[in-house]
Amino acid sequence: MTKQVEIFTDGSCLGNPGPGGYGAILRYKQHEKTFSAGYFLTTNNRMELMAAIVALEALTSPCEVTLSTDSQYVRQGITQWIHNWKKRGWKTTDRKPVRNVDLWQRLDLAIQTHVIQWEWVKGHAGHPENERCDELAREGANSPTLEDTGYNPD
């Protein structure tokens, strides 16, 4: 039987761009694991993507996942936009390179073995897991330790 897993994610940036962090909660039955990290210079969208990527990459076998995010960018990107980006060689409709392509490609790879239901939750609206992820993300942003080597200000 396929494991049923819940993932909650959030990203934060102090300035955009600026120091940023992500937070994620992975829940399987009564077990819970949290993920958090901070980057010296990044964007909020990159941190939203990283939260989902890190949690999904932690899964060791195919799972049925409900992933909750307050980022429409992540949810729409992975459920709608990515299909045409891939068809166009990772270009947008106006033939420009997709922003954050390194992370979109990593997320695309991370979802391959799972069945994922992407859910949007309103941020800062009292959703307990989203609030906890927001805290984790802000903690990371307030004490960054990593370089976001894929961040490319353009």
UniProtKB/Swiss-Prot annotation:
Quaternary structure, from the entry: Monomer.
Residue spans crossing the bilayer: none
Alphabetical UniProt keywords: Cytoplasm, Endonuclease, Hydrolase, Magnesium, Metal-binding, Nuclease
UniProt record similarity statement: Belongs to the RNase H family.
Location of this chain's protein in the cell: Cytoplasm
Cofactors: Mg(2+)
Segments forming a coiled coil: none
Full protein name: Ribonuclease H
Predominant cellular place of this UniProt entry's protein: cytoplasm
One GO CC term on file: cytoplasm
Upper classification of the organism: Bacteria, Pseudomonadati, Pseudomonadota, Gammaproteobacteria, Enterobacterales
Enzyme class (EC, first level): hydrolase
One GO MF term attached to the UniProt entry: RNA-DNA hybrid ribonuclease activity
Amino-acid positions noted as binding Mg(2+) 2 in the UniProt annotation, renumbered to this chain: 10, 134
Gene3D superfamilies: Ribonuclease H-like superfamily/Ribonuclease H
Stored Pfam families: RNase_H
Residues annotated as binding Mg(2+) 1: 10, 48, 70
Note on how the cofactor is bound: Binds 1 Mg(2+) ion per subunit. May bind a second metal ion at a regulatory site, or after substrate binding.
